[in-house]
Amino acid sequence: MSNYPEPNVIPSKEYEELIDAYKLMHKDERAFMGISLIPLTYIIKSIFEENKVKSFLDYGCGKGLLYTKDFKKADKGSKYPDLKEPIQDTFGITKFSLYDPAYPEHAEPPTKQYDAVISTDVLEHVPSQDLDWVMDKIYSHATKIVFLNVCGAAAIKTFPEGKHKGRNVHVSLFDNEWWVNQCHKIRQKHKHLKIYLTWQSTKGIVGTCIKGEEDGTTKSDRSSDKTAG
């Protein structure tokens, strides 16, 4: 892992308001445990192995319960893989960091770069006007790959109180093609990276891999029920 210079960004007022709202929601011990990572576990493990990943950052990890001895508390039933050990042990990686600006235990901004950054069920929680700088920040922490998972549908949760009471917590809803184009756009500053973008569909987990070609262009490889390599 190498040192990382923190970029100068000015979050929108809405971003700061929503972070405060998520902090309040985190007081419920059942909220944002990090379970969205569970169905993606073995997809990510395969990608890590293929790209020889030795270190990673989970950006927007929530409570990060899957990384603790209490990982089983986040296992929500048979539709998910049956985890036998904390997720970093499943990946076989000891060098990792957790970051979530709305959870005090993981709120310290990362200061290093990692082989990989993963961010699952995060970007749809970010106001649309802040997506460019948040994604640029995610990309900037990676030296090899970025793995993103997004949802294009409304969440079950709404904000329970405050200015945004009743608003769905998925504040940025876009179709899959929009996200692919957005990933391409942000990658223009990070052309050395492979970007793995996945989302849920009726066929399972569908994904695309955005990577550079020898002629300097980019391409997207798509696959269903797994992520392209």
Where do the PLM segments sit?
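Conserved N-terminal segment of class I S-adenosyl-L-methionine
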Residues: 1-114, 132-135, 141, 152-156, ...
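A conserved beta-strand element that flanks and buttresses the S-adenosyl-L-methionine
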Residues: 118
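Short N-terminal helix/helix-N-cap motif within the alpha/beta-hydrolase-1
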Residues: 127-131
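Short glycine-centered segments of the SAM/dcSAM-binding site in methyltransferase folds
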Residues: 144-147
